[in-house]
Amino acid sequence: MTDVWRLAIFVLMVNVLNDQVSCSGPPGPVGYPGVPGVPGPRGPPGQPGAAGRPGDPGPKGPSVKCPCRERSAFTVKFSGRLPPPSEPVVFTEVLYNTQRDLKESTGVFNCVEPGNYHFSFDVELYHCKVKIGLMKNHIQVMEKHQLSKNEYENASGAMIMPLRQGDKVWLEADVETEEPDQAKVVIYFSGFLISS
C-alpha cells in the first residue's frame, strides 16, 4: 500500500513539473537600454574618394598697361674709302637706329638711358693692316689688330660696359696699306641696352 502511494505521488509530481515547464506566460515589457560599451579600435583607412568637379572660373584680373619703352639699340656699317685715323668712324650705312641714340653724322653713340650696354664690332679687311679701338669718353677700352695680305681677314670684339646718361661711345680705326687701290675695309658696329 505504501508503494502505491509513493507511485501516485511520483506521477503527480511529474505531471506538475511538466505543466510548469511547458507553460509560459505572455512577454514582459521591453527593458531599459544597457550601458554603452567602450569604443572599438580604429579601423583601416578607406579607399580614396572620386575626384571632385572643377571649381568655377575666378573673376577676370585687372588690365595693366606696361610702361616699357623701346630699348636703345643700333647697328651700323662702314664700307668704301678708308676712314681717317684717330677719329670716330662715320658709318656709311645704318642698319638699325630707331631710337637715334647713335648720331649718324658723327658715328658717336650718346647714352640717354643709364644702364649696362653690350657693344660689339666686326672688321673685314683686305690688303691692309688695321688697328681698331673701342672708345668711351675719349678713353680706349678695347683694341684689336689684324693684318691682311693676299686674302680677307677678320677682327672682332665685344664688351659689356655700364654707362651713365651723357656717356659717349664710338670706334676709331687706323688703317695702313701699301696698295690703297686694292685695300678694302668693312666695319660693323652694334650696341644695345641689356639692363637699366
UniProtKB/Swiss-Prot annotation:
Gene3D superfamilies named in the record: 2.60.120.40
* Record carries keyword Secreted: yes
Primary location: secreted
The signal sequence is: 1-23
Record keywords, A-Z: Collagen, Hibernation, Secreted, Signal
Instruction: List localization entries.
Output: Secreted
What is the protein named? Hibernation-associated plasma protein HP-20
